[in-house]
C-alpha cells in the first residue's frame, strides 16, 4: 500500500494527512497559519475557551482558518470535570463550530494527566447526544477499550505529559492499545521533535496530534515541515515492515564466491 491510497479514516471521514495540529502558543496568527499550511495537517484542534463565541465581531483565530480547507476539532482543554467538558462541547455545537470533538478532562494542573473517571462520564453523555468523540486519555489499554466499547470514534493516549516534549515514554502500552482496539489510535501529547512522531507512527499508530512541539520550537514553520515529513516517513516505514532485531550480525553480501 502506498501513501497515495493510505487514508486515515475517523467516523467515516477520510483524511490524507495523519498529522493533527493545535493552534495555541504561536507568536501571532500569521505564524500559526504558515505552520499549519506547511504541516500538511487537515484536522486542526481549537480550544473552545480561546474562541470568542459571544462576540464574533472581534478578531478570533477562526478568522485565520479556512474552514473549507480544514476540519475543525474543538477541544475541551482546561476542563477538570465531566460537567464542564460536556457544557463546553455543547457551546461549541451551538456556536456552529463542530460536533466532532476532542474530549479532555484533566486531573490536575501540575501533570495535566487525564481524569479517566470523569472522561468516561463525559464521553457517555456526549455520545448519547450525537457527538463524534475523540478522547484524550492515559496510555491504559483497559480505559481505551472501554472508550471504544462506548462508541468513541478514536482513542488518543498520551505519549508523555502535555507540553513535556519527553517523547513516547511507554511504547509497550501503546502497542498493547493498538492490539486491543479497532478504532484509530492517535498519540496525543508528549511529542518533542520529529523522531518522536516517527516512532509513534512506526509503532503502528494511525496518527499524531501535537501543538507545543511545533509552536514552541525556535522555528515553528520549519518544525511543522519536519513533523510533516516524520509522520509520513514513520507511517511508510510501518507499512514497509522493519527487519527483526537480532543479537548477532548478518552479512548483507552473499558469502559464496569469496576469493581465496
Curated annotation (Swiss-Prot):
One of the record's GO molecular function terms? thiazole synthase activity
Q: Please give the coiled-coil regions recorded for this protein.
A: none
Q: In which pathway does it act?
A: Cofactor biosynthesis; thiamine diphosphate biosynthesis
GO BP field: thiamine diphosphate biosynthetic process
Which keywords accompany this UniProt record? Cytoplasm, Schiff base, Thiamine biosynthesis, Transferase
Give yes or no: UniProt keyword Cytoplasm: yes
GO CC annotation terms, alphabetical: cytoplasm
Q: What is its main location?
A: cytoplasm
Where does the UniProt annotation place the signal sequence?
none
Q: How does it assemble?
A: Homotetramer. Forms heterodimers with either ThiH or ThiS.
Q: Which family does it belong to?
A: Belongs to the ThiG family.
Functionally, this protein is described as follows: Catalyzes the rearrangement of 1-deoxy-D-xylulose 5-phosphate (DXP) to produce the thiazole phosphate moiety of thiamine. Sulfur is provided by the thiocarboxylate moiety of the carrier protein ThiS. In vitro, sulfur can be provided by H(2)S.
Q: What is this protein identified as?
A: Thiazole synthase
Primary gene name: thiG
